[in-house]
Amino acid sequence: MKTLIARHKAGEHIGICSVCSAHPLVIEAALAFDRNSTRKVLIEATSNQVNQFGGYTGMTPADFREFVFTIADKVGFARERIILGGDHLGPNCWQQENADAAMEKSVELVKEYVRAGFSKIHLDASMSCAGDPIPLAPETVAERAAVLCFAAESVATDCQREQLSYVIGTEVPVPGGEASAIQSVHITHVEDTANTLRTHQKAFIARGLTEALTRVIAIVVQPGVEFDHSNIIHYQPQEAQPLAQWIENTRMVYEAHSTDYQTRTAYWELVRDHFAILKVGPALTFALREAIFALAQIEQELIAPENRSGCLAVIEEVMLDEPQYWKKYYRTGFNDSLLDIRYSLSDRIRYYWPHSRIKNSVETMMVNLEGVDIPLGMISQYLPKQFERIQSGELSAIPHQLIMDKIYDVLRAYRYGCAE
């Protein structure tokens, strides 16, 4: 990460896409997409996905590392080209506890990530815990971030410290997208960004972390990009120019969250304006969902009724029976809920792919379709971009490859924006 940031600060148009997903097909796609390039791939886990208690994936940081490396070995991607990052590392998962208890868990969280070889650490202590004022004072946020940084430094080996980089910042959207409809978004003020940096510098120095400050590579701000279930707020470069100009006088770049669904031109403009780390998650699993839904429609027409997976019906049944991952985000009416379950840009389906019933139904669908020739006309109907690539000889009409290429469509836009 440090090398890439140095190249950007030297005037090169270069950025990096941060893949924030624990889905094996998304990770496989991210690695396979860049297998034949010289680029490194940044894959990040969030604190609610992966933590010392397992998170919602059931994986600790060490488990996640091995999970990613196993996929890398399978696709022939060199492990040393992978950068592992930890996102929202702080009290995010334990906000209902008092600050002392939440920070104690957060310290162990950060230590486990660093011990497991994660080298890009987002120190995010911005959320209020039980009994805290809302919002937290910037000084409190910075002091807690310094505690987390001290924890990271205390377990890092000399070799790890050479690679270790930190991201700071408090203006982070709700992990995974907005819960309600959005019409506009607040762009971070330069004064607030400067204050975030100033308070963190002061807190780090007070804890004897002067050297660690040199490892702070980025600050999280809101450049004016966001999405909810059916709306996307697109990047307006002119609105972010004060931020773009301010960061030029520092050693850092910006990290932009929730950049999903922007145009490829917007990604190029974001990187030009020093938002050099572009995080993406739901857009990748949304593309995966689109591919699976398309293949399910194809299966419906090609496979005998008694042999079909019933994949789409299984997904809806499971999500309606077990609504904990979408209930507080989606609309309440039955028809509206179904539309959101299927098509929301927030893509809460991503939490359900590991469910045994859904996983089994998708596997059945894939086996069914691997055993037949899919007519080109059906691929044109349901996966038109993939049809064009089949026609030009870039792609085969194999279900797994069709899913990969659908995810590649998202990655292609980021590659354009981050181009070396």
UniProtKB/Swiss-Prot annotation:
Entry keyword Nucleus: no
Pathway(s) where this gene product acts: Carbohydrate metabolism; D-tagatose 6-phosphate degradation; D-glyceraldehyde 3-phosphate and glycerone phosphate from D-tagatose 6-phosphate: step 2/2
GO CC annotation: plasma membrane
Entry-linked InterPro entries: Aldolase_TIM, GatZ/KbaZ-like, GatZ_KbaZ_carbometab, TagBP_ald_GatZ
Keywords: Galactitol metabolism
Family matches, as Pfam families: GatZ_KbaZ-like
SUPFAM superfamilies the UniProt entry points to: Aldolase
UniProt-listed NCBIfam families: agaZ_gatZ (TIGR02810), PRK15052.1 (NF011626)
The family this protein is said to belong to: Belongs to the GatZ/KbaZ family. GatZ subfamily.
PANTHER family referenced in this protein's UniProt entry, alphabetically: D-TAGATOSE-1,6-BISPHOSPHATE ALDOLASE SUBUNIT GATZ (PTHR32502:SF12), N-ACETYLGALACTOSAMINE PERMEASE II COMPONENT-RELATED (PTHR32502)
Subunit comment: Forms a complex with GatY.
HAMAP family for this protein: Tagatose_aldol_GatZ
Protein name per its UniProtKB record: D-tagatose-1,6-bisphosphate aldolase subunit GatZ
